[in-house]
């Protein structure tokens, strides 16, 4: 199972370190994937930040791309926070030689028409990996599976732990890779988190995105004996 460190968090949320090069490097060295957010300044430069911010030497995307190239087999989940520069983004990823590592997701939260961005991204680059969203907020499995260009399904449980084994098997039958958000990211207590981790593992989910990457790794090792 792939462990994806949410914004580079690995021992819980750490606002002073999350999304930092230091934290991400630690995660990549551990063999984990990472989830980060990419944004663009008005003059066309890219930076890594969950919230809109001011470009500086520490958050400039060039610095992160240099880091990622040192770990070419690691998976980077790239959350698109803005709409309208897809052509330039694909060019940027290709120029920095990290396209094979990343998959793009969360376009549905910002696009004016469902599936529009995934279709455009596929037209721009036949190899770029795309994830479609599924959640308990009017984002059903059937809709996500209708995005033919998406090889990955990104599962969210905002208000309820609603996913079942049948849901996972339905997605697997469609031959999609499945990554799930860990419950603590949406405020669920750790008791439910551990239970959900075990269920996801048993059901065959391919990866979990969590703020507790270190604990998830230890937990998986305990299951394996």
Place the predicted regions along the sequence by residue:
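Phosphate-group recognition and catalysis centered on beta-loop-alpha active-site segments
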Residues: 1-225
